Amino acid sequence: MAPCIPKKYTAGQNPVTKFEGAFVVTKMDPPEGRCFLFHTVINVNHHRVKALEKSGKKPPKHFHPNQYEYFKVISGQLTVEINDVEHILTPEDGEVTLEPGPHHRLWGTPGQKNDKVVFLISASTNARSYQLDQAFFENWYGYQEDMMMRGTAPDLIQVCCMFEAGDSYLSPPWWVPFRHFFGYWLTVILGYYIGSLLGYQPFFPEWTTDWDAACDKMASSLLQKKFAIRELQDVVKKNFDANGDPLPAKKLL
């Protein structure tokens, strides 16, 4: 295990295409009282999505203790698992509100008639510096894409580091007592304390559109302020082409 090194530059891109076109996310202006709003398209029949479905892998189950999350399906079907029960959302459901606390995860419903599920996702604002917001999603999906394209498994410490910075916490299995307690402290200890000491950071200039705001967050943290290097985004951007792909390494003479 080692801290992440981003392989693609997507900061400032809108819309953002992930997983070879399986996901397309457009950042929109959020309404009052919400900290982000994403228009998301998932191609459930894309070969990357089908491969995940075949493997049985699903997004990590987690919970948010301080924010409401909102889902609104525009077309297709979206599966949202809440406290280990799967719910299939459709346009007829309107906007669905997930209160703080439940263990949950979501994915495009497999086997549906439509190739694509289109939905809006947003969350309430939060007085905390670290919260579920655009910076979290930009980095989380950037990291997932890197892992998928390289065919490697996610690093648990890196995942916890990013989730803790998004005020989100991994959910232990259903049979673990005091799931919120253990999930919270597992994420904090691995992601913040151990991760920060080992050089893991929650936000990266390659993926974060508002890098200054991310630096403000990290600068407010005793263990993560060392990562708040504001000029770093201009430096790393020179290593990528206009499409965000890495430039060929220069040969030494």
From Swiss-Prot:
<dbReference type="GO" id="GO:0016114">
    <property type="term" value="P:terpenoid biosynthetic process"/>
</dbReference>
<dbReference type="GO" id="GO:0016491">
    <property type="term" value="F:oxidoreductase activity"/>
</dbReference>
<dbReference type="InterPro" id="IPR014710">
    <property type="entry name" value="RmlC-like_jellyroll"/>
</dbReference>
<feature type="transmembrane region" description="Helical">
    <location>
        <begin position="181"/>
        <end position="203"/>
    </location>
</feature>
<dbReference type="InterPro" id="IPR011051">
    <property type="entry name" value="RmlC_Cupin_sf"/>
</dbReference>
<protein>
    <recommendedName>
        <fullName>Oxidoreductase AOL_s00215g277</fullName>
        <ecNumber>1.-.-.-</ecNumber>
    </recommendedName>
</protein>
<dbReference type="GO" id="GO:0016020">
    <property type="term" value="C:membrane"/>
</dbReference>
<keyword id="KW-0812">Transmembrane</keyword>
<comment type="function">
    <text>Oxidoreductase; part of the gene cluster that mediates the biosynthesis of sesquiterpenyl epoxy-cyclohexenoids (SECs) such as anthrobotrisins and arthrosporols, metabolites that possess a novel hybrid carbon skeleton consisting of a polyketide-derived epoxycyclohexenol combined with a terpenoid-derived monocyclic sesquiterpenol substructure (PKS-PTS hybrid). The SEC pathway plays an important role for fungal soil colonization via decreasing fungal nematode-capturing ability.</text>
</comment>
<keyword id="KW-0560">Oxidoreductase</keyword>
<dbReference type="Pfam" id="PF07883">
    <property type="entry name" value="Cupin_2"/>
</dbReference>
<keyword id="KW-0472">Membrane</keyword>
<comment type="similarity">
    <text>Belongs to the oxidoreductase OpS7 family.</text>
</comment>
<dbReference type="InterPro" id="IPR013096">
    <property type="entry name" value="Cupin_2"/>
</dbReference>
<comment type="pathway">
    <text>Secondary metabolite biosynthesis; terpenoid biosynthesis.</text>
</comment>
<keyword id="KW-1133">Transmembrane helix</keyword>
